[in-house]
Amino acid sequence: MQYELTTPCTAADLAPLKAGDTVLLSGVVYTARDQAHKRMMEALDKGETLPFALEGSAIYYVGPTPERPGEVIGSAGPTTSGRMDAMSPRLLDLGNKIMIGKGKRDAAVKAAVVRNGAVYLAALGGAGALMAKSVQTLEVIAWPDLGCEAVRRLTVQDMPLTVVLDAHGGDLYEEGPAAYLAAR
């Protein structure tokens, strides 16, 4: 099935999604990679406020390239999500609902997705130019010293994504190959 979602999202918004479904995501999406995640953990440890509200948020694991004249953003392909695994459950427990990246996630992330009624969506790796076409606006909102890893607020329209982990424990990276092998 294909769904259209607009952020911020609630667990009820995400409940119908199943691993393998496609999503056209619109609204505000925040960018945060490895270093931004580390800074968020440090801020939380110190009791500081994060640069954006986590409740219902979508976080895209991306470090976009510089934009060309007349463009909003350069190439915006996903980075490997596993590097955020140690930090993602905490953000999910604090209200983050959508993670966007590529690659498998660990058992703790999967459990946190189910516990919080969240989802993990895959962006098409190697298609940064395609992903960039969805971005309408961009603003650096935190840690500009991190360069491409600074936290950005993106406004996106119909960003094409695939549900990998759903709120019911579905995992496309496990179910997809199993279904393929069973059909052979």
Segments from the language model and where they lie:
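Active-site/ligand-binding-proximal alpha/beta "capping" segment
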Residues: 88, 164-184
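Feature captures the catalytic cores and cofactor-binding loops of soluble hydro-lyases/lyases
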Residues: 31-159
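Short, structured beta-strand/loop micro-motifs enriched in basic residues and often containing a Trp
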Residues: 1-9
